[in-house]
A protein has these predicted regions:
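Short, positively charged patches
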Residues: 1-141
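Glycine-biased, small-residue-rich flexible motifs in mid-sequence functional cores and linkers
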Residues: 1-2, 82-366
Length: 366
């Protein structure tokens, strides 16, 4: 591990500094090495940090990475990726408060890997089990990866279905990746590391505390363009994932259920609020594949002709845009362009009819 990565790990573990502050420090100083060599006078002059954050930074600069974390990385073969790394899952840059660092065991998703998130009730019904196994196995059979949270019930069956077809699946944990929670999923945990990854923003040694799980839900939806709520009661934690998905501009789908079934009240309510309905796993996957084919066809014909005379910065921005929304923060990271140049290029692409704004300050290819 080189000095920069070691210091990025150290920066990630400074208590009292949020992800936003850590990224701002990297942007300001240019590298973790420079952050850790800054003087007290420089810290006091940082206008984007509060006095409390400045104190936290000064304390953190004196402390190396905790030995227990280093030992866990080695003992459990844990890797990590930071927001500064090209391997960092790009979709996660769109989530609220993107993790500064992600610890994982296994292999990260590829840049253009298609993922669908699947979540639902822990104490699911036979119907929920059947639906989650059927959909996840069919997704995997067609080369689409499954993202979930390793919980009992729908989460576990979603991972199992993907693995049954030799597919890839990813689990975001509410604890460190050196721990398997629940313990009964230890075998599933190990199989996921060989056909995907178990991932967490929490450092090794973090216990599965109750408050960690709603926080990690934003990453389950964030890693996917589409989120499926298989089965959920009226106050299910899965509805938190649905809320995050909507905030992130993701599509939300549900399996419908009987009106008098407590485990379908949450999903049926989402239908009432406008969520997509999955009439069958086959139809849902068929629609996904047709959307994928349509997106690929946009690279030819009229659009291709319109992109021939783009300015350099316009071409860079256009190549980074996709058919799902991206915001300026993510585009800035992907393109490396100064913010003003980026905004100007996006506006010109909008004027040309190549790009459109779908949400406030979020853009897609047309």
């Amino acid at each position: 591990m080189d000095d920069e990565r070691m210091l990025l790990l150290s920066l990630s573990q400074i208590e009292g500094l949020g992800n936003k502050a850590k990224k701002a420090l990297l942007f300001h100083f240019g590298s973790a090495i420079r952050v850790f060599s800054c003087t007290e006078r420089e810290v006091k002059g940082l206008l984007f940090l509060s006095e409390r954050e400045k104190d936290a930074l000064m304390s953190g600069l004196k402390e190396p990475v905790p030995k227990n974390i280093i030992e866990s990385l080695k003992s459990y073969e844990i890797s990590f990726v930071t927001v500064k790394d090209s391997e960092y899952p790009a979709l996660l840059l769109d989530v609220y408060n993107p993790p500064f660092i992600i610890f994982y065991r296994g292999t990260l998703p590829k840049a253009n890997e298609e993922c669908v998130a699947m979540v639902g009730a822990r104490r699911c019904s036979a119907y929920g089990k059947k639906a989650s196994l059927a959909l996840s196995s069919l997704l995997a059979k067609n080369g689409i990866s499954v993202v979930s949270g390793l919980a009992l019930g729908i989460d576990g069956f979603s991972h199992e279905g993907a693995l049954s077809q030799g597919g890839r699946t990813y689990a975001f944990l509410g604890c460190g990746v050196d721990l398997c929670y629940p313990a009964s999923h230890e075998d599933l945990f190990e199989r996921i590391t060989k056909n995907g990854a178990v991932m967490s923003e929490f450092p090794p040694g973090t216990k599965p505390l109750k408050n960690n799980f709603p926080v990690r839900n934003r990453l389950i939806s964030g890693l996917s363009k589409r989120v499926v709520i298989v089965e959920a009661a009226e106050k299910s934690g899965s509805l938190i994932t649905a809320d995050f998905a909507l905030e992130q501009g993701r599509e939300v789908y549900v399996f419908p259920g009987r009106y008098d079934d407590p485990l379908s009240r949450g999903t049926n309510k989402l239908i009432y609020q406008g969520a997509g309905v999955i009439l069958s796993p086959e139809e849902f996957v068929s629609d996904l594949l047709s959307i994928k084919d349509t997106a690929l066809s946009f690279t030819g014909g009229t659009v291709k002709g319109k992109t021939r005379n783009l300015e350099d910065d316009e071409a860079i921005v256009y190549s980074c845009l996709d058919f799902y929304p991206k915001g300026f923060e993510r585009l800035s990271t992907e393109t490396g362009l100064p913010l003003l140049s980026l905004i100007s290029a996006v506006m010109r692409l909008c004027d040309r009819g190549l790009v459109m704004e779908t949400f406030k300050n979020e853009y897609v290819k047309v």
